From Swiss-Prot:
It comes from the Bacteria. This is Thioredoxin-like protein SkfH. Required for production of the bacteriocin SkfA. It holds the Pfam family Thioredoxin_8. SUPFAM superfamilies: Thioredoxin-like (SSF52833). It comes from Bacillus subtilis (strain 168). Disulfide bonds join 41-44. The lineage of its organism: Bacteria, Bacillati, Bacillota, Bacilli, Bacillales. Disruption phenotype: When the skfA-skfB-skfC-skfE-skfF-skfG-skfH operon is deleted, increased rate of spore formation; a double operon deletion (sdpA-sdpC plus skfA-skfH) makes spores even faster. GO terms for biological process: bacteriocin biosynthetic process. Keywords: Antibiotic biosynthesis, Bacteriocin biosynthesis, Disulfide bond, Redox-active center. Accelerated cannibalism by skf- cells is seen on solid media but not in liquid media. Induction: By Spo0A and PhoP, during nutrient starvation, especially phosphate starvation. Repressed by AbrB during normal growth when nutrients are plentiful, in association with the transcriptional repressor Abh. InterPro entries: Thioredoxin-like_fold, Thioredoxin-like_sf, Thioredoxin_ResA/DsbE_sf.
Length: 141
């Protein structure tokens, strides 16, 4: 597969919340689901709790990739406060310069990107309809 269809390492300079990036190396012991979201995204607000509930007992690790809409959302403190207020305990990486977004070819949020244990992009979806499709894909792993 082409390099742009792989995420073989995390950009080392990006800040993480709730966990260290060193806990997520490739190859991984499980599939990884990247959940691209933003504090300013109304659809993300509606979908986040459903995503976390649906995925709870599945063989996949969720990583929230925060995509800033505005400059203020590049602040780790602002995102941390939001995550604490919402009870988001999942690992969150702040993709402040859209590096992971670019690697995964994400075109809008909320979006989902399923990675193999080796960082290969298996499938990508967007929105609530996309979430339903992603659930079916994960259930078939």
């Amino acid at each position: 597969m082409k390099d742009e269809q792989m995420l073989t390492e995390w950009p080392s300079h990006l800040p993480w919340l709730n966990q260290s990036q060193n806990d997520f190396t490739f190859p991984s012991d499980t599939y990884l689901l990247l959940y691209f979201w933003s504090m300013s995204c109304p659809n993300c607000h509606q979908l986040t709790d459903k995503v976390l509930q649906d995925i709870k007992d599945m063989n996949v690790k969720v990583i929230g990739v925060h995509v800033p809409y505005i400059e203020e959302e590049k602040s780790m403190e602002v995102v941390l406060t939001y995550a604490l207020d919402r009870g988001l305990a999942i690992p969150i990486v702040l993709d402040q310069n859209y590096e992971i977004v670019t690697t995964c070819h994400v075109q809008g949020i909320p979006s989902f990107c399923l990675l193999s244990q080796y960082g290969q992009i298996i499938t990508k979806t967007m929105g609530d309809v996309g979430w339903d499709k992603m659930l079916k894909k994960i259930a078939g792993l």
